[in-house]
């Protein structure tokens, strides 16, 4: 399960060096305003999907993907977020 997440994070990190015209992820990494807009949009769509009990998994995946890209673009490592969550378990 988490291997897929790790693979996604690695792909996002690799896309930093791609041409934004050829990679959607690279485009998001290079345009933080667009990425913030997408995260907001995807969260709204997830909430609507949960309320309608329809397409929840798809929308949740979109939120996770866009959030991971935004974190990476902002210099926030998912590993640091996971460490913070682990601290909160105590």
Language-model-derived ranges and their functions:
Residues 1-60, 64-90:
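Flexible "arm" and connector segments at domain edges
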């Amino acid at each position: 399960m988490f291997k897929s997440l790790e693979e996604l994070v690695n792909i996002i990190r690799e896309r930093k060096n791609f041409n934004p015209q050829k990679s959607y992820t690279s485009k998001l990494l290079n345009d933080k305003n667009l990425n913030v807009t997408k995260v907001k949009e995807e969260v709204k769509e997830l909430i609507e999907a949960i309320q309608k009990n329809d397409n929840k998994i798809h929308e949740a995946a979109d939120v996770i993907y866009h959030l991971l890209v935004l974190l990476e673009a902002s210099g926030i490592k998912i590993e640091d977020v996971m460490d913070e969550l682990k601290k909160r378990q105590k």
